[in-house]
């Protein structure tokens, strides 16, 4: 099993992801450069958080045109797994690999805090093994995490079990007060119809080490590689 982590100009969570996947979870991890088209045999490609290309125009709008994205799109279209976290999620939406868009937070402020999320999809590899009877705690750090999609798109996400996580309170209840950024339907992450491309705003790589006092994110990252035969 080989995990590829992409570095764009402005990425600042790539090394965190490499540490979580390689040191903490013991996967074989390779670094992928935005100017390359070579995925170096990666079974799973991860687009980490940060501020790719300075978030000019809007988050992810320039990164989607990077040479590496041509290979990532082809990888996804061939059934390969792709995972975007925070800015990576924004890039995947801009590239059309995931439905919807990420808008400015409802508060118009950058938010950095721990939040509670609950798994929703019972189909996606990321979430199906996570206990849905209680929330998990994962950090967020974003200014444009307000997920939006039109009404038809939202219904399709719900009907096709494509919603990965919703923001919730510490008791697992979804309500307006537990939604940190105004995301429609309290959505914190989604998958594509084929269930091989995933995106979420919270940072599981920042909650994958007992040294940091939180390993809730490790089960998400482990699920990413589940059932892949190599």
Residue locations for each model-derived region?
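Pocket-forming structural segment of enzyme catalytic cores
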Residues: 97-184
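N-terminal beta1-alpha1 cap of cysteine-dependent amidohydrolase-like domains
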Residues: 1-85, 93-99, 103-111, 118, ...
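Structured helix-beta-strand junction loops
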Residues: 78-79, 159-161, 193
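Beta-strand-turn-beta hairpins that frame and shape the catalytic cleft
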Residues: 1, 132-135, 192-197
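Active-site metal-binding loops of divalent metal-dependent hydrolases
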Residues: 50-51, 88, 143, 204
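A glycine-centered loop/beta-turn motif at secondary-structure junctions
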Residues: 187-211, 220
């Amino acid at each position: 099993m080989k995990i590829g982590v992409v570095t764009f100009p402005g990425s600042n969570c790539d090394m965190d992801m490499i540490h979580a996947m390689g040191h903490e979870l013991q996967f074989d991890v390779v670094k992928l450069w935005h100017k390359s088209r070579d995925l170096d045999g990666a079974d799973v490609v991860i687009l980490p958080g940060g501020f790719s290309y300075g978030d000019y125009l809007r988050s992810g709008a320039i990164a989607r045109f990077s040479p590496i994205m041509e290979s990532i799109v082809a990888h996804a279209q061939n059934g390969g797994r792709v995972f975007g976290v925070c800015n990576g999620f924004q890039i995947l939406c801009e590239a059309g690999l995931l439905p919807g868009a990420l808008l400015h937070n409802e508060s118009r402020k950058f938010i950095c805090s721990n939040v509670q999320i609950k798994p929703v999809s019972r189909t996606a590899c990321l979430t199906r093994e996570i206990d849905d009877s209680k929330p998990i705690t994962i950090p967020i750090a974003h200014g444009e995490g307000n997920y939006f999609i039109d009404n038809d798109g939202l219904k399709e996400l719900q009907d096709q079990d494509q919603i990965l996580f919703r923001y919730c309170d510490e008791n697992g209840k979804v309500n307006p007060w537990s939604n940190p950024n105004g995301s429609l339907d309290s959505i914190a992450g989604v998958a594509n119809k084929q269930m091989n491309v995933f995106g979420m705003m919270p940072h599981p790589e920042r909650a994958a080490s007992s040294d940091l006092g939180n390993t809730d994110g490790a089960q998400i990252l482990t699920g990413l590689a589940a059932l892949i035969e190599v």
